[in-house]
Amino acid sequence: FFISILTANAQSVVGKWKTFDDETKEAKSIVEITERGGKIYGKVIEILNPAKKDIKCKNCSGADKDKPVLGLEILKGLSKDGKEYSDGKILDPSNGKLYKCTVSLDGNDKLKVRGYVGISAFGRTQVWTRVK
């Protein structure tokens, strides 16, 4: 019984993930991915640079405008589609833009997060690592 739970959990995107800066490759934040109503969502639960702990999403629009990045939901409403999650959005707090998004596991401890405009070929992929 416990083995099946561990196996299922090991292959799930649900959990805590460390994000990295595209340019510097430094660890940036911890995002916790949860599932609600069959869709996944990701919230920033920790900002790793002490100087940036209090930053706000100045360039965001709507309900996210001027909200603290800490606690901000950046992955929004992705649905499972085979081995990946898609049909949702990712918010880039640095520029306030929402992008279409796909998320897929690469092994148990790496998560490929792709944000794009229009078609997936015009985008970029980040690799997040599982926090244990």
Model features per residue range: what roles?
Residues 12-26, 124-132:
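K/E-rich alpha-helical interaction surfaces of small helical-bundle regulatory domains
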Residues 22-24, 93, 104, 118-119:
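Short polar/acidic secondary-structure junctions
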Residues 108-110, 117-132:
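Edge beta-strand at a domain terminus
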